[in-house]
Amino acid sequence: MQKKRIGKSVVAALAIIAMSAGTVAAWADGAPRTNDFWWPERLDLSPLRQHDVESNPYGKDFDYAQAFNKLDIEAVKKDIRATLTTSQDWWPADYGNYGPFFIRMAWHGAGTYRTYDGRGGAGGAQQRFEPLNSWPDNANLDKARRLLWPIKKKYGQNISWGDLMVLTGNVALESMGFQTFGFGGGREDDWQSDLVYWGAGTKFMSDNRDKNGKLEKPLAATQMGLIYVNPEGPNGNPDPVAAAKDIREAFGRMAMNDEETLALIAGGHTFGKAHGAASPDKCVGAAPAGAGVEAQGLGWANKCGTGKGADTITSGLEGAWSVDPVHFTMQYLDNLLEHDWVLTKSPAGAHQWMPKDAQDIVPDAHDPSKRHPLMMFTTDIALKVDPAYSAIAKRFQAHPEEFKLAFAKAWFKLTHRDLGPKARYLGKDVPKVDLIWQDPLPVAGYQMIGDADIAELKRRILASGVPKSELIKTAWASAASFRATDYRGGANGARIRLAPENAWAVNDPASLSKVLKSLEDIQSGFNRNRTDGKQVSLADLIVLGGSAAVEDAARKAGYDVKVPFSPGRVDATQAQTDVASFAVLEPTSDGFRNYYRKSNERSPAELMVDRASKLDLSVPEMTVLVGGLRALDANAGHSRLGVLTNRPGTLSNDFFVNLLDMSTQWTKSSSADGTYEGRDRKTGALKWTASPVDLVFGSSSELRAVAEVYASDDAHEKFVRDFVHAWTKVMNLDRFDLKRS
């Protein structure tokens, strides 16, 4: 499965790339203008078409998990260790060790992850592509990846760039004396840039806060082009108190609490140094996206001095946090807490801090005869002045083993957060312990039901008296909580019966509880009488109930179809479900159920595409599911919007037939905001009501083209078959065991 992500506007995404591409004039003569140039408000469907399998040079049959499992990972680690201390003349290693450089590479690759939409992270190795490869915060990481190219070249398809970069960060830490928590492979590479909304700014380092001073959702970085926060302080203001607020908000949106945040910063800044030998504005050239072809994808060429080594310029900040930057020590915390720090400036003019009693005690990274003072960023000093962070720092300083474990676990979380549940992890170094942020599931201690059991359970469900539309809504609500951006949610675990999902407004809690009670009664009755060791989970029963209702609706339409069903889901407990962590999965809009909160800033149609992209759907799959769910009367809140049929509950193509019927004229309702009325063109009689999501399948030229296929006289059976296929896909989105088997 490939991750799919949507930006707030493709125009904005293109603008960020274009402003880096200084060598090519925007819309040069002869270059085609996209439709977005002429009509920026048109519905953009490109998020449903990116990461197409045809873009993958390994082909559609390539199985990365199978390839990775053939890898001699110890041999890879050995090659990484050799690379760490083999300094290259074209980019010399600080202190003779690339370890800190590679830690930064891995950190910045994973650190783009954000909880609100699950986008970003190490998966896909997006750091290779624009805009991330040209962000100011990723300056010179192009060299880190080039240093790793011989290893990637050697092992080819057996290890992805995403896995290699994270593994290299781990090996770097271990080579410098730190014990990591573990490593899981499984990050498949992307082959093109993601469409991600990184902020409204049109230039790098612009503030990502809204007019009220709040960091815009779903963003996590405080300024355009940064991974987290500005190390000099908010917008370059060296205010440690304000910086602490930024740190807490940014890291919190990346799923880190105060302890994890402190551990990550303190652990990471134990190693390496910052680079600000001179002013970036005067010395440094274009980022990779704006460099000439002769640069071969490298950027930030430095014309001052040698342009490398002692003359390296990255952030403009200069210096190290400890006197031993290539070994794990407690010096960062000791230095931070025990010195009085005063504001100063780097040789490049950047705000940073030095001890009040500064001495030249830090070895030079390239000349053993030189020494320098210690330094700290404003964001480091923030950890000392903020009461909560300071208390944690002092505790870690007094208890080094606690600090080591906290850093190891926080680093593991940082680099694995977007990999999804533990079932997706590959390799022998996966920790045995389950962590709450992995959304753990129990192991089934029983045998799975067989075909005869499935048939009997479907019979019992359909005879239970639960309305078929409610069975469909419950199954959809359970499975469609999945998001392909970070592989969270889904039907496995039956977390729809647990907090917080059981109280989400979109799930109609009152109706949901009745359906779940009926299904639980069927489950207990079935399991109680078994003597053969077979049991059925509620998670399986929820999906089976929806599938049985779909089959019944297809029969009403005249088609005898069998919805594929694979048992194997289990039931999670409330203790295995972090309520706050799952809260960010709550939909504020679901076009498939015609649900939309007016507090949303984006349109219902845009958010439908966003949701479809998180469900890994194509344009035809999204289209057939919307039409089918309307026919099945599966709207949230029992809404009649878009139910363009006189036979709800029948799996018909009526939605498309009636939407495209020219005898109907659509107008905005004068009494209900966000509602449209379809009236008979001749008589004016009201026939239907619909939402903007419904009408976009007739107004968008691309969606209308697909809708016409399903509205055609010869499309009845195709519609049913395609709906069943798309439905089954959604039901199985989190069945990683099926994809591996």
From Swiss-Prot:
There is a cross-link at residues 228-254 (Tryptophyl-tyrosyl-methioninium (Tyr-Met) (with W-107)). Keywords: Heme, Hydrogen peroxide, Iron, Metal-binding, Oxidoreductase, Peroxidase, Signal. Residues 1-28 form the signal peptide. Formation of the three residue Trp-Tyr-Met cross-link is important for the catalase, but not the peroxidase activity of the enzyme. Binds 1 heme b (iron(II)-protoporphyrin IX) group per dimer. Bifunctional enzyme with both catalase and broad-spectrum peroxidase activity. This is Catalase-peroxidase 2.
